[in-house]
């Protein structure tokens, strides 16, 4: 297997997309579309530093990183991880172990090009941290925010059966406005993506302001609006993202943007009119999305990083977002790990 390092991602995008489609553990956050939007809209996290693994010329693995200067250290992080919910190496099924072994060797070989590697929000099934350790790199893992996932059964009735009767009654009551037609859900077509993203961000800002909170600064920046619009413009037609607009008696009141594939639903972001809070649009959307994902045959509904109390209402599995800090073996890199810099201040 041959490994190359790339600073320009444009020549890789077509092969990247094909590899992502073939990877049975990939998520929408690992798409070529996500990477391209991150680079084009200043959300990459630094200069692209992408390792590709080829077997006989065929792309069989890809590690999408970005390198930036942090004080005196050159830090590698997942490309576009500022807004991604989870991350992993891309690899063809059956070749992941060999790909990760080869990537670990290449990172050691290129240790003069970086001082620290910080892999954040690893997927539940990620094995790259263990592969890097076996490859002779020094790593320190730590648990981050809760990352609740709901295991989806074969039917929605089976999902409801997990709950006490009073909770089942309340869940069905939450869905009644949608099921009886008072509230309607419209999937936004590709031609309306840009307007829908703008509406979502406006609603979210007003929703938070109504309760005396401010959005995270990064979410209020124009670059985030451009990034999210670019991602949705590519992934909505591909079936890897969906924007749903909810209307109450004909008046639009909420917009939600989520990502999905054949295996899992990834809740991402939404916003609603403060006056519609009585409908609890968030709970309504999660319940409707869980029901739709069950009908689509998905196995998991990812509720996003964070331990907010409302997520426990849906009885998720208690997964935790895991990160790993890796040193290049050089003196200042080892010293930073000992001091806890990589696992702490570099998050």
Where do the protein language model's features map onto the residues?
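Acyl-group handling in specialized metabolite and lipid biosynthesis
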Residues: 88-93, 186
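C-terminal secondary-structure termini that scaffold catalytic or DNA-interacting sites
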Residues: 334-347
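Residues forming anionic-ligand binding surfaces in small-molecule and nucleic-acid pockets
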Residues: 77-85
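A conserved beta-strand-loop-helix scaffold within acyl/acetyltransferase catalytic domains
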Residues: 2-56, 60-78, 122-147, 155-156, ...
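Short beta-strand-to-loop capping motifs
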Residues: 91-94, 150-152
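Conserved beta-strand-loop-alpha-helix junction that forms the acyl-donor binding cleft
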Residues: 119-127, 303-309
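Aromatic (often tryptophan-rich) hydrophobic motifs at membrane interfaces
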Residues: 50, 54, 62, 84, ...
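Short secondary-structure capping/junction motifs at helix and strand boundaries
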Residues: 112-119
């Amino acid at each position: 297997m041959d490994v190359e390092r790339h600073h320009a991602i444009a020549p890789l995008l077509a092969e990247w997309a094909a590899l992502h489609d073939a990877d049975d553990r990939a998520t929408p956050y690992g798409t070529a579309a996500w990477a391209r939007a991150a680079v084009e809209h200043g959300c990459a996290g630094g200069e692209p530093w992408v390792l590709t693994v080829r077997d006989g010329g065929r792309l069989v693995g890809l590690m999408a990183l970005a390198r930036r200067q942090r004080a005196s250290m050159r830090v590698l992080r997942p490309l576009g991880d500022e807004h991604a919910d989870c991350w992993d190496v891309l690899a063809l099924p059956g070749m992941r172990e060999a790909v990760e072994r080869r990537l670990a060797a290449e990172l050691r070989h290129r240790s003069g090009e970086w001082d620290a590697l910080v892999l954040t929000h690893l997927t539940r099934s990620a094995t790259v941290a263990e592969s890097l350790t076996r490859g002779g790199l020094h790593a320190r893992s730590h648990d981050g925010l809760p990352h609740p996932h709901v295991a989806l059964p074969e039917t929605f009735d089976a999902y409801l059966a997990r709950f006490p009767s009073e909770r089942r009654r309340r869940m069905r009551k939450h869905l009644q406005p949608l099921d009886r037609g008072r509230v309607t859900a419209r999937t936004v077509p590709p031609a309306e993506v840009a307007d829908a993203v703008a509406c979502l961000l406006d609603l979210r800002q007003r929703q938070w302001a109504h309760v005396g909170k401010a959005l995270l600064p990064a979410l209020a920046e124009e670059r985030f609006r451009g990034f999210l619009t670019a991602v949705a413009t590519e992934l909505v037609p591909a079936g890897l993202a969906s924007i749903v607009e909810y209307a109450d008696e004909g008046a639009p009141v909420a917009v939600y943007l989520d990502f999905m594939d054949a295996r899992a639903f990834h809740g991402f972001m939404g916003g609603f009119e403060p006056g519609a809070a009585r409908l609890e649009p968030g709970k309504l959307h999660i319940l409707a999305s869980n029901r739709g994902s069950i009908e689509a045959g998905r196995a998991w509904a990812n509720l996003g990083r964070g331990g907010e109390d409302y997520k426990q209402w849906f009885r998720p599995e208690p997964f935790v977002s895991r990160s790993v800090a890796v040193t290049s073996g050089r003196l200042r890199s080892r010293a930073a790990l000992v001091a806890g810099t990589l696992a702490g201040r570099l998050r």
